[in-house]
């Protein structure tokens, strides 16, 4: 085993010894808090496990395995440190797992505020320092050349308070493809970590799944999902990772946006289907507005309540579907995330305090294309718009005074658009994919209550529905254009039906959304140049 140096803050620990022909490599030594863990020793050339990397400020790398053995695991990172990479296997063994990233440090405290005498105002306290970033996860080790799978990537460490979560480690090439590690979660005010990419497959293997994006802390943005990676000659790819959820706001603050979904991987070159795009994360909710102060006796109530937050988290966009192999189907686009609801208005005094508008839903992802004989992937559904926040309640009058007006309700958020033109059908035979439906518009917020004899507020307007995605064009020789769902929200126009090309019928136009006014129907797709019927209008 390598020499430990845990008490030397920046020391580098000794590496583990290695074996010649048959036998296990030694473990790497443990490094100090700011040092590097020792690398694991290599396993024997013919037979023998590799030694594990030592823990440290930066984890040591795992050693390489023998011909028939597994690579050593990477050491864990210290506080904020990077996890060590997993060791590679020889001929048959699996790669070692990557080390976990260290947790970021907490935020520093702000300076305490100073209070003066009653005739002067006190000074504000200082802001707290930013939290440390979480360490990145180590990469997974490479699988054995013939049979071994790649090691899993280490997950990113959590960010400290105010810190950003670490990115997930990427998967590595192997016969069967290892998955990416998930992104670390952000601390309060922190951004979620990005999910790691899935591992690439070998000749027959399946691509690794993209890592999920980390969830955000309060007011932070959700991390993006990692992309799925392509399959081998015959294998299917990994799907895109799901976007992280946006953080909720503190009182009166803004909610964070949801992370975007990762793109689906492409199918194997010959037979594989395209992977589905990951769904977008939901937006974070906004905070409630603060209450107004009461006026003095005998007068009108003076200061108004703070309005609800005008900035709420929008839903993340769905990831695009992957392209198919020569004979496979395109992957479906991911659904858009939901928009967050608007914040409630505070209790008003003389001036009304309105609720804030709901956020827009995320757009659906585009469907993946087929190549020769397959069906195009469907476009993703748009996310629903968030509901508008309710208006604030009118303030109660003090003796001899006048009550405050009630606040108006916030407008509902617009629904997300459906996936745009969805995937095209195969060049020779196959059907174009359906367009994604638009998301529902959010409901308007309710008016606040007034105790009188003052004004009641108005109800907020509902949000418009998202526009449905267009259907895909049909294949060059035979086949129909894709159908197009209409918008599911209020008043939006339906999408255009897909056009046929040489022989085939046009797709049906999407229905218009209901509302005031109602949305117009989408136009039907064109017929094929030689034979076919045009699509009906929505």
Q: Predicted segment positions?
A:
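Glycine-centric low-complexity repeats
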Residues: 1-538
């Amino acid at each position: 085993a390598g020499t430990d140096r845990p008490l030397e803050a920046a020391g580098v620990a000794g590496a583990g010894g290695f074996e010649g022909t048959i036998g296990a490599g030694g473990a790497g030594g443990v490094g100090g808090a700011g040092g590097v863990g020792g690398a694991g020793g290599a396993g024997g050339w013919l037979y023998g496990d590799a030694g594990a990397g030592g823990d440290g400020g930066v984890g040591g790398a795992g050693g390489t395995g023998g011909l028939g053995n597994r690579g050593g695991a990477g050491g864990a990172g210290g506080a904020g440190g990077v996890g060590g990479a997993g060791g590679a296997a020889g001929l048959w063994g699996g790669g070692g797992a990557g080390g976990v990233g260290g947790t970021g440090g907490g935020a520093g405290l702000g300076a305490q505020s100073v209070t003066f005498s009653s005739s002067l105002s006190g000074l504000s306290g200082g802001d707290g320092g930013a939290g440390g970033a979480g360490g990145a996860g180590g990469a997974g080790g490479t699988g054995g050349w013939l049979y071994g799978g790649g090691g899993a990537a280490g997950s990113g460490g959590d960010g400290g308070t105010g810190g950003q979560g670490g990115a997930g480690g990427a998967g590595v090439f192997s016969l069967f493809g290892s998955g990416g590690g998930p992104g670390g979660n952000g601390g309060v005010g922190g951004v979620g970590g990005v999910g790691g990419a899935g591992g690439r497959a070998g000749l027959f293997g399946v691509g690794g799944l993209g890592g999920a994006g980390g969830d955000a802390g309060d007011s932070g943005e959700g991390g993006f999902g990692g992309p799925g990676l392509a399959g081998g000659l015959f294998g299917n790819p990994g799907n895109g990772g799901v976007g992280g959820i946006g953080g909720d706001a503190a009182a009166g603050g803004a909610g964070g946006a949801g992370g975007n979904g990762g793109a689906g991987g492409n199918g194997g070159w010959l037979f594989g289907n395209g992977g589905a795009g990951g769904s977008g994360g939901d937006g974070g909710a906004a905070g409630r507005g603060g209450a107004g102060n009461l006026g003095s006796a005998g007068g009108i109530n003076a200061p108004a309540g703070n309005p609800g937050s005008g900035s709420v988290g929008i839903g993340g966009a769905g990831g695009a579907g992957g392209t198919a192999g020569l004979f496979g189907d395109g992957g479906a686009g991911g659904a858009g995330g939901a928009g967050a609801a608007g914040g409630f208005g505070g209790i008003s005094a003389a001036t009304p305090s309105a609720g804030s508008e709901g956020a827009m839903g995320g757009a659906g992802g585009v469907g993946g294309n087929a190549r020769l004989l397959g069906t195009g992937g469907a476009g993703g559904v748009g996310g629903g718009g968030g509901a508008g926040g309710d208006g604030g309640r009118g303030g109660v009058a003090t003796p001899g005074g006048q009550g405050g007006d009630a606040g108006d309700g916030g407008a509902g958020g617009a629904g997300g658009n459906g996936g745009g033109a969805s995937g095209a059908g195969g060049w020779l035979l196959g059907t174009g994919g359906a367009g994604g439906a638009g998301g529902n518009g959010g409901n308007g917020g309710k008016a606040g209550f007034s105790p009188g004899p003052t004004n009641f507020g108005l109800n907020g307007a509902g949000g418009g529905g998202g526009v449905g995605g267009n259907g895909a064009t049909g294949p060059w020789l035979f086949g129909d254009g894709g159908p197009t769902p209409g918008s599911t929200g209020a008043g939006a126009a339906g999408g255009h039906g897909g056009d046929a090309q040489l022989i085939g019928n046009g797709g049906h136009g999407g229905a218009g959304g209901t509302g005031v006014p109602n949305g117009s129907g989408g136009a039907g797709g064109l017929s094929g140049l030689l034979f076919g019927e045009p699509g009906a209008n929505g």
